[in-house]
Curated annotation (Swiss-Prot):
Pfam families: ACP_PD. One of its GO terms (biological process) is fatty acid biosynthetic process. InterPro entries: ACP_PD, ACP_phosphodiesterase_gpbac. This is Acyl carrier protein phosphodiesterase. Its EC number is 3.1.4.14.
Length: 193
């Protein structure tokens, strides 16, 4: 899961959106640096990552990547799941339009920015102003996201080529998304994530 899915599942679970978004920017035990609700959100994010990576649908999808891109498949798939969520948002969350959800999420996250790591602050400078969560629905934007990540982290250069794996298996990936994401939504609503 990437930014949009973590925020969405956090909302469904009535968990801290701030903590769920911040989690990838925090190493180790967050308890000494953040309030309890944010810490709980960080822990939820980490549980979701472990759960998602071990889903049979996700393990199967990783195998569809070519040998030269399989190492970055988990990252690429996380971004792709956000694509499908953004694209099908009106079906999955009909009572909370994506644009409104994005504004709501931004308001929640802004409260912790003054005490956040610089890389997280930098992300927030772009995430909201450039409407990433809405733009995830466009595959051209997904390609830009993968290229941007590869540019910032040269050891992840294979992300550029992983675009072709997504393109080649688009329909099958979408099917897998529909198999697991509604289950995760139900788990979040039951506060079972």
């Amino acid at each position: 899961m990437n930014f949009l899915a973590h925020l969405h599942l956090a909302h469904l679970a009535e968990s801290s959106l701030s903590g769920n978004l911040l989690a990838d920017f925090v190493r180790g035990n967050p308890e000494e640096n953040f309030p309890p609700d944010v810490v709980a959100g960080i822990h939820m994010h980490r549980r979701i990552d472990v759960l998602t990576d071990n889903l049979p649908e996700v393990r199967e999808a990783r195998e569809w990547f070519r040998r030269e891109t399989r190492r970055v498949a988990p990252i690429t798939l996380d971004v792709m799941w956000d694509h499908f969520l953004s694209r099908h948002w009106s079906q999955l969350s009909p009572d909370f339009p994506l644009q409104e959800f994005t504004c709501y999420a931004r308001e929640q996250v802004m409260t912790i920015l003054p005490d956040s790591p610089p890389r997280f602050i930098n992300l927030n400078n772009y995430l909201w102003s450039e409407q990433w969560l809405v733009r995830y629905r466009d595959m051209d934007f997904i390609q830009n996201v993968l290229n941007g990540m590869a540019s910032r982290r040269p050891r992840l250069d294979a992300l550029r080529d992983s675009w072709y794996d997504l393109d080649a298996h688009y329909d099958a990936l979408e099917t897998r998304f529909w198999q697991f994401y509604p289950r995760m939504m139900a788990q979040a609503s039951r506060k079972a994530l």
